[in-house]
Structures are given as C-alpha cells and as structure tokens.
Amino acid sequence: MSNSCDLTGHGWQNGNMVSHSNRKTKKRFMPNLQRVTVFSDVLKQKFRFKVSAKTIRTIDFKGGLDDFLRNTKNSKLSKSALVLKKRIMKKVSGDGTNDRKA
C-alpha cells in the first residue's frame, strides 16, 4: 500500500474516464501524496509522513498535528495514526500543562 496516505489511509480509486463521445475507459485515480515533516507540540518531536494534499490542508486548518489527531474520529485514521494519537492522548492526560485551548 505504497500509494496511500499515512494518516488517513486514503488510497487510489477506480473509475471511468468519459470522453466527449461518451466512451468510457478504465482509470485509476491516485491521491496527491507528499512527503512532509510535521512537529508535535505535545510530544516535542518531528514526524515524517507521506500524506495527501487534502490531509495537509486539514492539519493546517485544525491547528497542527496534535489537534488534527485529537479531533478526528478513530474510524477515519489509519493504524499508524491511531498509535500516534494514543501516545498524544496519554501525554496530555498525564500532564495538565498542555491544555492549549485555555
């Protein structure tokens, strides 16, 4: 699964390319994957991921990697993202000083 997002697990999709004359040919739609390094404020550590452009925009919108993982449902995250989310939640619950939305 090299063509999938490390955080959300979004991969390629199959579909049809439809011409002007309405001919249909099979097409594989690949996600726009980028290698990014993201910093976790809670863990004080950098993480390198291969993520889709949509996920990068969502991380920026949510306010960083920590808030993205905390506010995203577990069903929408990949297994590696769930492991990282668990580490972040454990660190936040054990240390009351990391409440960023005060």
Curated annotation (Swiss-Prot):
Highest taxon, organism lineage: Bacteria
InterPro entries named among the record's database cross-references: Ribosomal_bL28, Ribosomal_bL28/bL31-like_sf, Ribosomal_bL28_bact-type, Ribosomal_bL28_sf
A Pfam family annotated for this UniProt entry: Ribosomal_L28
Gene: rpmB
GO terms under cellular component: cytosolic large ribosomal subunit
Gene Ontology terms describing biological process: translation
Region of interest (Disordered), residue spans: 1-27
Keywords tagged on the record: Ribonucleoprotein, Ribosomal protein
MF annotations from Gene Ontology: structural constituent of ribosome
Family stated for the protein in its record: Belongs to the bacterial ribosomal protein bL28 family.
Protein's recorded name: Large ribosomal subunit protein bL28
Gene3D superfamilies documented for this protein: Ribosomal protein L28/L24 (2.30.170.40)
Xref: PANTHER family: 39S RIBOSOMAL PROTEIN L28, MITOCHONDRIAL, LARGE RIBOSOMAL SUBUNIT PROTEIN BL28M
Feature: compositional bias, Polar residues: 1-20
